[in-house]
Amino acid sequence: MEILKLPVGIENFEDIRRSGFYYIDKTMLIEQTLNNWSKVTLFTRPRRFGKTLGMSMLRSFFEIGTDKSLFDGLYISQNKSLCDEYMGKYPVIFISLKDVEGLSYDEAFQVFSRIIGNEISKFSFLAESDKLTVWEKEQFKGLLHIEKGKFIFDKDTFTASLKLLSQLLYKHYGQKVVILIDEYDVPLDKAYQNGYYHEMVSLIRGLFGQALKTNDYLQFAILTGCLRISKESIFTGLNNFEVVSIMDSMYD
């Protein structure tokens, strides 16, 4: 009997599946999420509870061009109709905010800008897409302003970035996007500790407001975090918004 390696510290679903690590099958989460659909779902779980690996799994399932064999032998593969309808069908924007911190707001904003810029860079093919107009290609290039090796955003461009990227991906693929945001609350926690909480709340409220509330190109979004931040602080006006805690048995 083959003894599988334990994936200590590995949070990438594809790496675990390709490298033959032991994997506790959590793919029922995909089925549960789709069967209990909300436009925006926030999963709150304690630290070290597999949130990032779960989000990596969701990306691998929904993302256009995914290797469907990654799910061979797992629970979700038994639901053929669901896999046929949803697997590999969506552009996916995936950002993790677990590293967004700094002793000042400017430091944290620079880290945040790098994370957003790196994700946008993964879609560099949009700059040459024959589905986009010349103006739309210029808009995309405007999201990738780099000086001295750093992504440079003003606040307005930053807060509009995920919504604009969604629009351009929709134009290219003809399909609405899935947005996954991991550890959404870390920047707020770090900001509170270092005295710039209100500035960070304003920034994230603007980013989420455009990406999750007024985004006509959004199929659905899933967020994870340890804390349930007051809806009035950063989720103001979100419709069809669901918070799923560790106490919700339907997501066991």
Predicted regions mapped to residue ranges:
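Phosphate-binding site recognition
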Residues: 1-252
